């Protein structure tokens, strides 16, 4: 048994990885900021100790896992060096862990977490699968043959991984504080593709994914008959979305997903492709797909009277559009109200017009102050720059949250990757609703 200390244990990936090592029988603790982060619930439920940052947390015979947001001059990392301990970066450690399994990486600019959550749930319907999801959820199942995990492209961290399979949901320009342009993003994915051992499952409509140059098979999925795996005869029902799946031009089977929106059908196709390639029982896969309940902060719903209140991680224009589309398809008779908190100044600056365009698809828009990151907490623009681009939009905070009560028959979308949950919590308190994130 190894004693692990995670520096930045509340980070979504770090939280997941800490839970996995705990499940596999190791002693695990970690440190982070003292303010509430939704990932800490799962850690506390497993009895994993969360400490405030302090050099004295680091003791002899520990292995220290260093979160990517924390520099080498962090007090705990400095102490670990003084004690000559093993210090391993998060992505390097995860790269080591996956080598023990048949591994499936899920990467892409958008849809990673939802697809990884679906993949782990569906695969566990047929084969024991450990998993790491970017919503702070992780599980290490002793005796697992498979490992499903989320692989982030930021700073090319995913190049530490050599998975058996990779699902690539899309390539898009994001993280403008690191990537120069879309070609730089493509270069990162091309290099990641070269690390994959058995096969790549990629969205067929993505022009950049179509250019991948590898020696292993690439299976494209989508809605076109030219794709290797595609969906036809899509029907939206009260139970969800039903569709037929064709593989290499031949009918495979009919599936029902409890989710709505084309992006969720695409996620399901990618997962079905993996199960097909690994010869999993299709009846088990169908049954598992029906019972998928979603992942944290991805269209998580709470119904209060005639309002549907949604907590969602959407923080890029395309993700916002997809979330609004889901609300429209699932609740066509309701208005859609967007409450959005931009995440990082660099992303807000880079996609200012795109944010305005995607948010304008809602019936009413409320905006919060821009949320900075640990690496970047100031910028040259303000939230007023976005407000001025969206007709009828207005600023909202915890003190003015009661304005949302006037939208009687509506879906209220709380979207963002920062601390938008503070507003959501304030609104629930205003409504007298108890909700544990």
Curated annotation (Swiss-Prot):
Where ATP binds, per the record, is at 108-114
Instruction: Give Gene Ontology CC terms.
Output: cytoplasm
What's one GO BP annotation on this UniProt entry? cell wall organization
Q: Where in the cell is it found?
A: Cytoplasm
UniProt keyword list: ATP-binding, Cell cycle, Cell division, Cell shape, Cell wall biogenesis/degradation, Cytoplasm, Ligase, Nucleotide-binding, Peptidoglycan synthesis
UniProt main location, coarse = cytoplasm
Signal peptide position in this chain?
none
UniProt pathway: Cell wall biogenesis; peptidoglycan biosynthesis
Entry GO MF terms: ATP binding; UDP-N-acetylmuramate-L-alanine ligase activity
Q: Which reaction does it catalyse?
A: UDP-N-acetyl-alpha-D-muramate + L-alanine + ATP = UDP-N-acetyl-alpha-D-muramoyl-L-alanine + ADP + phosphate + H(+)
What is this protein's function per UniProt?
Cell wall formation.
Q: What is this protein called?
A: UDP-N-acetylmuramate--L-alanine ligase
